[in-house]
């Protein structure tokens, strides 16, 4: 998950530098990096919630 945050930060930096230097390609690359990092983070969150739910269901079945 830290890698996803790093990718977002890197994207933010690229976007800012691209904006300041009027480099539209770098700005767009930064936007893409940020979006990719956010998407990966969202997928990781869904995986974690699914695993928590599976563990909870397994725990309830163990008590029966």
Curated annotation (Swiss-Prot):
It comes from the Bacteria. Residues 22-64 have a biased composition (Basic and acidic residues). InterPro entries: CsbD (IPR008462), YjbJ_sf (IPR036629). Coiled coil: none annotated. It holds the Pfam family CsbD. Residues 1-64 are annotated as: Disordered. Belongs to the UPF0337 (CsbD) family. This is UPF0337 protein SH2043.
